[in-house]
């Protein structure tokens, strides 16, 4: 009897240690659940890496060697990019299938559920559910919840790289329901998350379809296909006459600058180079494709001012002017996301100047590849300023700036721009000369306006990506809400006939 009494006391002490005191419990759970610690109901294993100096450990691909990047497989981890030889098996800590793997260094909280035997590197802590206490998939879903993710971040070390060590992992709060309810929770979550997964897949398919259609529409626009019927029914001005007018405008602008220089007592500016129309047209052997007869191939720099000189303007130094940082330029719309204002005196040096109707084109990676481009509309003053990582394109009267905007949004143009970038990794930029020399298919002015009208109409129906992104965000919020309810016992999975969870703890203790 004395021996039995001693066992009973020992069990009570173990229970007391395993259970979370009421005043420390994160939130209220059903009466037949208990709050315990992760390490009480799971074996936690930190991975390790066999020596890279031992070639035999890496010779054959016998055993999956999981690293953080592999965790992107989520609910169904079935392979790893890297494997080890079976001769290294004594040098690693093997993980059975149905293990939940968590990144504990760097991208803390990234999680996957393994459907295969594997091992992992030291950046991963793995949870092996204790038999007849925790249903393995319950671990996976719990770790994905906002509650558990927050715990991990709060308990990680505040160093240059966040680290959640094994000891801290073991102490994390764990809401333990009866075993049968764990299974019902998992079944319901599997069902609901299969629905949200399918919804996300459909959204992704639609996004790809929309993007492909936009690419096709823009391609047809700049080959004259969109306006084929219109062209046959309407007379247009001569495009070559448009090019002639460029020279007239250059000379007029130069004369105005000369008068201003004389007035200011400055040296006259250099006379602009005047080209014959035939010299403005791209040679036939350099033309990317055949255009309609009324169109011509020109270099972008012939019809657009690329990074024009700053304009002198009489503004008080403390006057506020428009300021546009890179983050305020949209990847999908010509409109500025948000207007900022700064004092004129703070922007005169070290920033890029622009005026109304200029186009801002992000020249640095990855902003350029992401499509950051905008048309400047209203300005508080006659000028504004922005990041030095913009190319400024100023349309002349022979080119519609919205047509130019759509040209710059083409996938093909951006791929060419990316290929011609210069600079070191992370700081690669599109050179000014690339912008100036790029071939541009110039239609007659009237046809430009018709192309813009058609594109506005068609692309308005195609620009649904923003709405889809908002829908994706709502699905993400829904998933978080579902998990939140699941681990509070609010998913309708309870059964009063279930054996209380405390009995599970007693069995394993």
Question: Where do the PLM segments sit?
Answer:
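Phosphate/adenylate-binding "loop-and-lid" substructures adjacent to NTP/NAD/dNTP-binding pockets
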Residues: 9-13, 235, 240-289
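Non-catalytic DNA-recognition/assembly elements of restriction-modification systems
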Residues: 19-48, 175, 179, 183-186, ...
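Short coil/turn segments at secondary-structure boundaries
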Residues: 51-59, 154-156, 228-235, 257-263, ...
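Short, ligand-facing micro-motifs at secondary-structure edges
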Residues: 49-53, 71-83, 97-121, 125, ...
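A short glycine-rich beta-alpha junction/loop motif
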Residues: 20, 104, 118-126, 136-137, ...
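Sequence-specific dsDNA recognition surfaces
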Residues: 23, 39-54, 69-97, 115, ...
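Amphipathic alpha-helical coiled-coil/heptad-repeat segments
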Residues: 1-12, 151, 171-241, 248, ...
């Amino acid at each position: 009897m004395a021996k039995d009494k001693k066992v009973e006391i020992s069990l009570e002490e173990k229970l007391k240690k395993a259970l979370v005191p009421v005043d420390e419990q994160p939130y209220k759970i059903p009466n037949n659940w208990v709050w315990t610690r992760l390490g009480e109901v799971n074996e936690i294993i930190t991975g390790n890496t066999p020596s890279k100096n031992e070639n035999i450990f890496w010779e054959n691909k016998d055993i999956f060697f999981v690293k953080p990047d592999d965790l992107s497989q989520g609910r169904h981890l079935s392979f790893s990019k890297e494997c080890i030889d079976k001769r290294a098996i004594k040098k690693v800590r093997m993980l059975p299938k149905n293990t939940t793997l968590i990144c504990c260094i760097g991208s803390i909280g990234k999680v996957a559920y393994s459907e295969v035997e594997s091992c992992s590197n030291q950046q991963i802590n793995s949870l092996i559910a204790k038999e007849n206490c925790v249903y393995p998939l319950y671990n996976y879903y719990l770790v994905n919840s906002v509650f558990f993710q927050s715990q991990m971040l709060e308990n990680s070390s505040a160093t240059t790289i966040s680290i959640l060590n094994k000891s801290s992992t073991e102490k994390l709060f764990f809401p333990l329901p009866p075993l049968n309810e764990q299974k019902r929770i998992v079944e319901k979550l599997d069902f609901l998350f299969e629905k949200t997964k399918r919804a996300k897949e459909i959204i992704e398919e639609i996004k790809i379809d929309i993007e492909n259609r936009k690419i096709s529409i823009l391609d047809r626009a700049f080959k004259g296909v969109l306006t084929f019927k219109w062209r046959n029914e309407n007379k247009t001005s001569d495009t070559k006459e448009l090019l002639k007018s460029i020279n007239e405008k250059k000379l007029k602008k130069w004369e105005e600058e000369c008068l201003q220089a004389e007035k200011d007592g400055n040296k006259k500016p250099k006379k602009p180079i005047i080209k014959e129309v035939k010299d403005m047209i791209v040679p036939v052997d350099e033309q990317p494709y055949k255009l309609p007869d009324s169109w011509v191939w020109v270099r972008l720099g012939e019809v657009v001012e690329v990074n024009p000189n700053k304009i002198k303007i009489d503004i008080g130094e403390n006057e506020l002017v428009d300021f546009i940082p890179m983050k305020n330029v949209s990847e999908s719309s010509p409109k500025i996301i948000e207007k900022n204002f700064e004092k004129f005196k703070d922007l005169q040096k070290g920033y890029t100047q622009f005026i109304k109707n200029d186009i801002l084109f992000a020249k640095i990676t990855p902003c350029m590849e992401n499509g950051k481009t905008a048309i400047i509309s209203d300005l508080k003053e006659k000028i504004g300023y922005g990041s030095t990582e913009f190319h400024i394109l100023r349309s002349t009267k022979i080119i519609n700036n919205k047509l130019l905007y759509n040209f710059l949004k083409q996938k093909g143009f951006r791929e060419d721009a990316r290929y011609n970038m210069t600079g070191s990794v992370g700081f690669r930029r599109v050179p000014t000369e690339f912008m100036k020399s790029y071939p541009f298919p110039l239609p007659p002015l009237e046809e430009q306006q018709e192309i813009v009208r058609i594109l506005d109409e068609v692309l308005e129906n195609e620009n649904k990506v923003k709405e889809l992104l908002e829908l994706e965000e709502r699905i993400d919020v829904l998933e978080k809400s579902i998990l939140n309810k699941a681990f509070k016992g609010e998913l309708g999975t309870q059964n009063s006939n279930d054996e209380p969870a405390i009995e599970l703890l007693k069995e394993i203790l």
